[in-house]
């Protein structure tokens, strides 16, 4: 027969379970073989004899007949009859088996008497098979075991009908094999065709029936879900308005929807589809385009377990799609019960990742967006852009009434972790002298400062200070307290700020309690916001210790190296201080770095002069509490000239009797005393900030002198001192650059200080610095 043609019955044929013919017999296998197609066969003794002789090998492979039970004469081909009852056609892969009707051509006229004679032989053979065959059912021999359940003679009623129209359709369709219909090729001469198929755990073959053909197939005239179905076969589902499921649609079929919600099948026949079957496991295909970035990967399916998913008879029917991969031969099963979702919304599904579908099922993956727009109401599996699950279930993060359970891995904490002392790592008792310390270090620091003890380290000033060894070396403990930032002035400043806040609160309460002030606006409002000078007092850096060992004989190299290391730490403190100045961080970041690179020596020299003025009456240079340059140390080589410039600043502060508020304002103005010749990126804002602190210096002068005629004279003297700082800093920088470039002196520089000097050297050599002076020379 022609392999390119399909065996398609006419539209007027009734797909009933019992079919009649005028000159033939009717065999009904549907009662025994569920899932098989009802077959209509017209048999002749001649054709059956020829088929028996040509396919004798197939019969021997099919069943084992007992000796003497059936004669070796002409026997009807049982493999064809039973195979056709199962809806399988193994001879030609492109031939399609349709619906519940199966027709195939025969040659010549078929007589009723010959058909009855052959039918008797068939019944005898089946009876012998019933006595000899006792093989239990299993997933791989489910089709073979169906043969033993053949119907008896009374199940084949003899009726007659006119089949002339069918013979017209089948006329001339005989092949080159002499008119005999050959159901199997040489390499397919076996009846148990399911032995090579490995069914998945969710496939129909794993059911109690142990037969994948005992499920209701979703078929029409143009498609059949069988292992021989090609990738072009369609899958059509029955849908109604109560179903909340979207069928998988291939590109070649586009179902339509009626007004009542039913699907209009694209098939040419009006075959009533069976009720969709509910299976044991539930699978959900999660497609979230627009929510998660899509990658060109194979679709991954998730298995969701919902309670009550196998309820049969619910109005909300489930999806059950059965298909076979043509590449791997493995059957997959996907279904979803939406009734349990709508009934138990608060039940959270458990998702397990299922491996991607093989290549043969890629057509199923293209169901997204392949149908018409009106099909989106049929299901909620492939809604694009949806951020929550269908049927009212949403993720816990999207539902305010559902709180996610706490993680089992999180440990219950009774309270916050204990805070440790920054000096000895013991449990801290609070913030003492501006630092979080324990009570022991608090008392030690207070006694060390007030008692003015001159502690000396017996080692190398690097002793370990912890809870056990903190009493071994008081010198290193005191040094660590200073490095942590402990300062007695911090306590006084805290009390001062607290007193100002209490006074301000008392004044505001008195003003609010006075009924006369409720309607009358006072002439002068109290100063509720802190002044710039008070803020400058709070952010002033703490005094740092140099860690210099006075027991070792002094040398220029050791003193210079110690001063450089101290200078590097002071630069870091100056950067933090500058960032805390009101208005400074509003400047461009490049401008902030430029101002710090130009003014770091101004800040350290002016602070050194202030400490020397307050602690030694400008006679000594107090670099640190543990490093004071006296007259004896000044006589060391290369020390006197530099110390002379620094003593000038201290002597001027002592001569003018500069107050602390004036010193803070002058120090801030020194930060803003040098700019590049090309100007800053935020030059206007810089000029505004600088003018603000010039006015603050004037306010500090008025606060000290009062409304006297000497205010302008003092302002002139203080600004003149600021201008003289340029000459002092210039001499100090020249010596610093010389020692930095002269490697023979072997003077060490900290990393940050070396970086600043490296960036500053070319600017000074090129003269790219503009001095902001108050007075002309």
UniProtKB/Swiss-Prot annotation:
PROSITE patterns in the cross-refs: NR_LBD, NUCLEAR_REC_DBD_1, NUCLEAR_REC_DBD_2
Family label: Belongs to the nuclear hormone receptor family. NR3 subfamily.
Name of the protein in question: Glucocorticoid receptor
Organism, scientific name: Saimiri boliviensis boliviensis
Pfam families to which the protein is assigned, alphabetical: GCR (PF02155), Hormone_recep (PF00104), zf-C4 (PF00105)
UniProt remark on domains: Composed of three domains: a modulating N-terminal domain, a DNA-binding domain and a C-terminal ligand-binding domain. The ligand-binding domain is required for correct chromosome segregation during mitosis although ligand binding is not required.
Principal subcellular localization: cytoplasm
Record's compositionally biased regions (Polar residues): 164-174
Numbered residues of crosslink Glycyl lysine isopeptide (Lys-Gly) (interchain with G-Cter in ubiquitin): 419
GO cellular component, one term: cytoplasm
Gene3D superfamilies: Erythroid Transcription Factor GATA-1, subunit A, Retinoid X Receptor
Summary of subunit composition and partner proteins: Heteromultimeric cytoplasmic complex with HSP90AA1, HSPA1A/HSPA1B, and FKBP5 or another immunophilin such as PPID, STIP1, or the immunophilin homolog PPP5C. Upon ligand binding FKBP5 dissociates from the complex and FKBP4 takes its place, thereby linking the complex to dynein and mediating transport to the nucleus, where the complex dissociates. Probably forms a complex composed of chaperones HSP90 and HSP70, co-chaperones CDC37, PPP5C, TSC1 and client protein TSC2, CDK4, AKT, RAF1 and NR3C1; this complex does not contain co-chaperones STIP1/HOP and PTGES3/p23. Directly interacts with UNC45A.
GO biological process assignments: adrenal gland development; astrocyte differentiation; cellular response to dexamethasone stimulus; cellular response to glucocorticoid stimulus; cellular response to steroid hormone stimulus; cellular response to transforming growth factor beta stimulus; chromatin organization; gene expression
Stretches for region Disordered: 1-22, 130-182, 394-415
Positions bearing Phosphoserine: 45, 113, 134, 141, 203, 211, 226, 267, 404
Region (Interaction with CLOCK): 485-777
An example molecular function term from Gene Ontology annotations: Hsp90 protein binding
